[in-house]
């Protein structure tokens, strides 16, 4: 499940690959952005169970040390980065994207296919263009691995996110249930099929 930003507004950001040194910051960002975006949908116990399991330090360490996965963090350049490079490393990230091998439950998924697994932006930056920047970086990284297709899951009621992904060439391919505690969300699976010429 992921949520993008929409139309770029020319706000400067610094984006870089995450490392194990970013573990605590990534955990805080992951918990905060998921709760801001989807927390209202769930009973408190279901939400807490999901946050503790999905965004535990162990789970995030596994992602950051997996060579098949990549996480990028974005920082507001007005807070840290361009004007003070040292401040960038102490400021809190404002968005992130996670890419890796596809694990969605669809019969057409093939070994080597890629997935945009998470894309989240802090509240207040939803129209900054940051989601599109992160999406482009993650897609390019996945394309370097020459997959047959790219995939992602998106909440069935998130029309805005679906339109965003359509602009990146993703189309509806199926449905599944996304587990949050005892709750099951109705999710769409979207796919971007790739021709050989586009993978070169």
What function would you assign to each model-found segment?
Residues 3, 8, 13, 17-20, ...:
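Acetyl-CoA-dependent GNAT
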Residues 22-25, 130:
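Terminal low-complexity, poorly structured segments
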Residues 19-22, 158:
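Acidic/polar helix N-cap motif
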Residues 118-136, 145, 156-163, 167-168:
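Conserved glycine-rich acetyl-CoA-binding loop
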